[in-house]
Amino acid sequence: NVASFADEAQQHRSIAEQLAHQANLVNRAKRYLAYFQAYTSTFAEVQVLRSMYQQAVSQANIVGLCVGTRPDCVPDAVLDLLCEYKDQGYEVWLELGLQTAHDKTLHRINRGHDFACYQRTTQLARERGLKVCSHLIVGLPGEGQAECLQTLERVVETGVDGIKLHPLHIVKGSI
């Protein structure tokens, strides 16, 4: 349910316009990372992604990219593209929406991937020198404190550079 998470007005602006608008809102910062998060930011042909990412890094004060996606939507060609930006000196973060390390829960919430897929994607990204941040959800149905701690342990073991914890948030119209 993207409408709950994305400003409708932003959806009709160019990447340059969105970045300029957000920079004005947080004008105390001097440098920015362009954050591609809405939808799956790697689910397009590489030339389309290159155009989007290039629009972002060509803006003043943009020093890198944060690209949010699912672990099952990161083919080698996309990892190679992200490496091109890293090799040009940009800071590049691949943010993976894992949610949990428990396959039973991933199946229950219809994620379409398992923990092994996440591990593979993380390993491939880390081998290329990309920074990886994992998004996890606390409070998923059927999971308690023990499962949350197990997820954290398993994710840390993959060598990620960052973890973002989110509470379970059910949005009207999403179920």
Describe these PLM feature segments.
Residues 46-54, 75-86, 146-148:
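Distinct, well-ordered alpha-helical segments
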Residues 59-65, 131-134:
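Short, surface-exposed connector motifs at secondary-structure boundaries
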Residues 20, 24, 82-87, 119-127:
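Surface-exposed amphipathic alpha-helices with a cationic face
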Residues 75-77, 102-106, 142, 171-174:
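Active-site-proximal flexible loops/turns
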Residues 116-174:
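Conserved C-terminal portion of the radical SAM core fold
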Residues 57-58, 83, 156:
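Non-catalytic positions within long, well-ordered alpha-helices that form the structural scaffold/packing
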Residues 2-46, 61-74, 91-117, 162-164:
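Core AdoMet radical
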